[in-house]
Amino acid sequence: MAKQKQQYVTIKGTKDGLTLYLDDRCSYDDLMKEIEERLVKRSSVAANSPLVSVHLKVGNRYLTPAQEEELRALIRRSKNLVVDSIESNVISKAEAIEWVQKTEIVTVSRIVRSGQVLHVEGDLLLLGDVNPGGTVIAGGNIFILGALRGIAHAGYAGNKEAIIAASVMKPMQLRIGDVMNRAPDYKTDERNEMECAYINEHNQIVVDRLQLLMHLRPNLTRLERRM
């Protein structure tokens, strides 16, 4: 009895089209060969048939941009199939570095003086002051163990869940995501208590005691535990 050939492609129909589960242990060439055999050569669909979306799940296989394009082109040859998404469990080195930069906590010990700009991709922990005219910008949260008397912009890429915290909160301007507070409408005093700025349910920046943060942002725990 002839041994049954192992299949590297599993096809499942969904309400959104077709999902192809591609084996991540076989060679790339064997994978392409089976896709061509099952989807292209056996295709008998009329040229005017409606397009069907195809979602590829490639598991732990990394595909280069050129290989992704080759896959899309091969499947498109079956007349009515078009690749809508390619999902992989792995990322490239460049993507990994970018992810780390955006999620890491960057600790800086310095004074940001007038005219200076300190910019980080992830969360910022500043051990020092931000003087009037100085600016700190972060892709994530900003924590200042010192006085904030200049400009602070957290979540600059649009993250409205970001917060700004400082030992002394007397900023010239606060920005979180695309929300800006030019003239803070809150009063500060000389209490030795950290304060934090966040966006409330009315899409406005408000400042309150840092202790309230555990209720406002329960998932924000990485830096608070260190301060």
UniProtKB/Swiss-Prot annotation:
UniProt xrefs under NCBIfam families: minC (TIGR01222)
Organism of provenance: Geobacillus thermodenitrificans (strain NG80-2)
Gene: minC
InterPro entries attached to this UniProt entry: CAP/MinC_C, MinC, MinC_C_sf, MinC_N_1, Septum_form_inhib_MinC_C
PANTHER family found in the cross-reference section: SEPTUM SITE-DETERMINING PROTEIN MINC (PTHR34108:SF1)
Assembly and binders: Interacts with MinD and FtsZ.
Domain of life: Bacteria
SUPFAM superfamilies the UniProt entry points to: Cell-division inhibitor MinC, C-terminal domain
Keywords: Cell cycle, Cell division, Septation
Gene3D superfamilies on file: 2.160.20.70, 3.30.160.540
Function, as annotated: Cell division inhibitor that blocks the formation of polar Z ring septums. Rapidly oscillates between the poles of the cell to destabilize FtsZ filaments that have formed before they mature into polar Z rings. Prevents FtsZ polymerization.
Keyword Repeat in annotation: no
Gene Ontology BP terms: cell morphogenesis; division septum assembly; regulation of cell septum assembly
Protein name, per record: Probable septum site-determining protein MinC
Family statement drawn from the similarity comment of this UniProt entry: Belongs to the MinC family.
Any Pfam family hit: MinC_N_1
